Regions:
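Hydrophobic/aromatic end-of-helix segments at the C-terminal termini of transmembrane alpha-helices
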Residues: 4-9, 13, 23, 39, ...
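Interfacial/gating helices of multi-pass transporter permease domains
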Residues: 8-29, 58-60, 96-102
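Hydrophobic/aromatic residues within the transmembrane alpha-helices of Major Facilitator Superfamily
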Residues: 4, 31-34, 77, 110-114
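Short runs within selected transmembrane alpha-helices of multi-pass transporters and secretion channels
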Residues: 2, 25, 40, 100-126, ...
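Alpha-helical transmembrane segments of multi-pass membrane transport and lipid-handling proteins
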Residues: 61-113, 143-151
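Helix-loop junctions and terminal segments of transmembrane helices
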Residues: 24, 28-72, 118-124
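Short helix-capping/hinge motifs at transmembrane helix termini and TM-loop junctions
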Residues: 9, 13-14, 82-84, 91-95, ...
Length: 177
């Protein structure tokens, strides 16, 4: 299910659109994945130690969420702002159509990184089964978003992806407390 958007774009649009999306997706995931893994591996052991003290755990989750937001918002906002000159410097004008997609995917990355953090919170409090259900819900929401936005173009399709990431984050935030 990880590559469904590439599959959909490749199947319903032309290869040029797939190339633009792939370029934007590849570059957006580099920083998002690295930052998410660093934060996740740092916080999970701490949360696991607090599993038996719910009040202390919720305070720690709140502080860690604020710290995560404090770190990622400026980084991702900066990437969104410098996307155009960055792409033009690295790739020239031939990938200009990837810039908006990159910016949208970086915006999605804010919620993706926060969701990775909340995944660790849910694992830290021992609610492992809920993770499976949340992934199923996210996949269903993704399919609905694809179905609704498919005929509207690649940019709107990516906006649907962003919307699903926001909804998934909100569900995770609600469940993690």
């Amino acid at each position: 299910f990880l590559n469904i958007y590439s599959f959909i774009i490749g199947s319903f649009y032309n290869l040029k659109h797939l190339g633009y999306y792939t370029q934007a997706d590849k570059w957006s995931k580099m920083g998002i994945t690295a930052l998410g893994q660093i934060l996740g591996s740092s916080f999970l052991p701490i949360l696991a130690d607090m599993q038996d003290n719910r009040e202390r755990l919720h305070r720690a989750i709140s502080k860690m969420n604020k710290l995560t937001s404090f770190i990622i918002f400026p980084i991702y906002a900066g990437l969104i702002i410098v996307a155009e000159p960055l792409f033009r410097t690295l790739f020239g004008n031939k990938w200009d159509a990837s810039i908006l997609l990159f910016q949208l995917l970086i915006f999605r990355g804010i919620f993706t990184t926060l969701t990775v953090f909340l995944n660790n919170c849910i694992l830290g409090i021992g609610k492992v089964k809920i993770m499976l259900y949340l992934e199923i819900v996210k996949d269903i929401l993704s399919l609905i978003a694809i179905f609704i936005t498919l005929e509207m173009g690649v940019t709107i399709l990516v906006l649907g992806q962003v919307f699903v990431s926001i909804l998934h984050y909100l569900l995770m935030a609600y469940i993690s407390g």
